[in-house]
Amino acid sequence: MFKTICVDHVGIACKDLDLSKKFYTEVLGLSCTGEEAVPEQGVKTVFIPCGETLLELLVDITENGDGPIGKYIAKNGQGIQHIAVRVDDVQAAIDTTIEKGAAMIDKAPRGGAGGMDIAFVHPKSVGILLE
């Protein structure tokens, strides 16, 4: 069994990372805590603490703009792309999710930003992409 700890972050797909960072820092007065490319996912991320959770700005870094974030923006426009909850055991969360009948995109944890193990629940199961 696993324990859900908190909402970890809200992933926001954006076309222009610098413009988005400027809004969150200069307009909302927040600070960026880290910027990281995750080439295996074709994305660059920036985390921005906001109270008890994080905002994660996501921009496509693939050559043709056809990574997951580029495809998301092409289909849906910019905006909330996923919500992430922190759990104490990612594999147990995957196993329980499958056991309860929800569809997983990932059947095993994979590497994410900040060295975290991540996995995604298919949005058809829960109404939004859930990490």
PLM segments and residue spans:
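Short glycine/proline-centered loop/turn elements that form peptide/ligand docking sites
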Residues: 19, 37-41
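Short loop/beta submotifs within extracellular cysteine-rich repeat domains
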Residues: 20-22, 31, 53-57, 65-67, ...
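Helix-adjacent hinge/juxtasegments
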Residues: 56-81
